[in-house]
């Protein structure tokens, strides 16, 4: 399972990001910033996180879904940093679009090493 997320920001686009992220998690696609929790046996049975530089949490969620593992999202939420989205509204939209594009390309089979080269690792 995972926790829902929220941002301290009152920006409409951050609220939208939260809604989309929580909706996706409710459908079984969980990202690392959502505080994934899982039984040890299931973690090992799923092959643990793949050794790839990006999308390892996404791939793990896809694997769990393919295995038929049901995921839940708690009513509790995690406060997630918005630092990768800081700046103007245009910047927020550009980052959101870029991240969605990286996921789409990953699903299409593009090499995660190549995708990682384009990842804005802002931490």
Give the label of every model feature segment.
Residues 41-45, 77, 84:
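Short, well-ordered alpha-helical scaffold segment located
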Residues 1-13, 79:
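Short beta-strand-to-loop element that shapes/binds the nucleotide-sugar donor at the catalytic cleft/hinge
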Residues 15-26:
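Short, glycine-/aromatic-enriched active-site segment of Class I SAM-dependent methyltransferases
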Residues 50-52, 62-79:
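Catalytic donor-sugar/metal-binding loop of nucleotide-sugar-dependent glycosyltransferases
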Residues 29, 36, 71-72:
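Residues that recognize and position ribonucleotide moieties
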Residues 32-47:
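Conserved nucleotide-sugar donor-binding
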Residues 36, 54-61:
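Conserved glycosyltransferase catalytic-site signature
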Residues 89-118:
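Catalytic core of nucleotide-sugar-dependent glycosyltransferases
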């Amino acid at each position: 399972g995972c926790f829902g997320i929220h941002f301290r920001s009152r920006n409409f686009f951050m609220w939208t990001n939260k809604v989309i992220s929580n909706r996706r998690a409710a459908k079984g696609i969980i990202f690392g910033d959502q505080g994934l929790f899982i039984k040890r046996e299931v973690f090992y049975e799923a092959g643990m996180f793949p050794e790839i530089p990006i999308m390892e949490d996404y791939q793990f969620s896809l694997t769990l879904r393919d295995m038929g593992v049901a995921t839940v999202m708690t009513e509790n939420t995690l406060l997630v940093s918005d630092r990768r989205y800081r700046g103007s509204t245009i910047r927020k939209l550009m980052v959101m679009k870029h991240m969605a594009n990286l996921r789409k390309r990953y699903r299409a089979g593009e090499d995660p090493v190549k995708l990682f080269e384009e990842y804005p690792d802002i931490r």
